[in-house]
From Swiss-Prot:
InterPro entries: C-type_lectin-like (IPR001304), C-type_lectin-like/link_sf (IPR016186), C-type_lectin_CS (IPR018378), CTDL_fold (IPR016187). Oligomer. Homotrimer; non-covalently linked. Glycans are attached at residue 122. Belongs to the alpha-type phospholipase A2 inhibitor family. Glycosylated. The glycosylation has no role in the association of this PLI and PA2 enzyme. Expressed by the liver. Residues 1-19 form the signal peptide. This is Phospholipase A2 myotoxin inhibitor protein. This phospholipase A2 inhibitor binds directly phospholipase A2 in the presence or absence of calcium. Has anti-enzymatic, anti-myotoxic, anti-edema inducing, anti-cytotoxic, anti-bactericidal, and anti-lethal properties against basic and acidic phospholipases A2 from Bothrops venoms. The lineage of its organism: Eukaryota, Metazoa, Chordata, Craniata, Vertebrata. One of its GO terms (molecular function) is carbohydrate binding. The keyword Calcium applies. It comes from Bothrops moojeni. Disulfide bonds join 83-160, 138-152. Keywords: Calcium, Disulfide bond, Glycoprotein, Lectin, Phospholipase A2 inhibitor, Secreted, Signal.
């Protein structure tokens, strides 16, 4: 959308710089201005629609972060690239409501998924007896949102975390 707006501005700028002797009444210029204004309104409408959907999904999950699965099953190695290419990150719930939103996805799919726990995490949800590095060096969440040590070779549900700074 921004590319279209920039193209319109470029055309308008070129037109103004060169002038147009075949359009003395300025019909082309007026048409370009009208088109640009229409595109600006459309962009504003799309932005509003996007923000409305984001707010509704955030409201429904109780979290400003969205957790989404592509339904694939993978080990930990490709997960960072998969999420990054989608514009997200490996899940890293920082608050209880974020962990609940993450767990809702796992419960819907009846599968566990990887997450990343930061060194300075203020929130954790380790299951009893966890973490246990004997089970592995990665971390997975079960369908209830409890965290467990896991092998990084386990094939788990691919879930990515998305959040928007507005």
């Amino acid at each position: 959308m921004r590319l279209i707006l920039l193209s319109g501005l470029l055309l308008l700028g070129t037109f103004l710089a060169n002038g147009d002797e075949t359009d003395p009444d300025g019909q082309v210029l007026n048409s370009l201005i009208e088109t640009l204004m229409h595109l600006q309104r459309e962009f504003a409408n799309l932005k509003y629609a996007f923000l409305t959907v984001h707010k509704a999904r955030s409201f429904g999950s109780g979290s400003e972060r969205l957790y989404v699965s592509n339904k694939e099953i993978k080990n930990f190695e490709p997960l960072g690239d998969i999420c990054s290419q989608a514009g997200g990150h490996i899940p890293s719930p920082q608050l209880e409501n974020q962990n609940k939103a993450f767990a809702n996805v796992l419960e819907r799919h009846n599968k566990a998924a990887y997450l990343v726990v930061g060194d300075s995490a203020n929130f954790t949800n380790w299951a009893a007896g966890q973490p246990n590095e004997a089970d592995g060096t990665c971390v997975k969440a079960d369908t209830h949102g409890s965290w467990h040590s896991a092998s990084c070779d386990d094939n788990l549900l691919v879930v990515c975390e998305f959040y928007f700074i507005l």
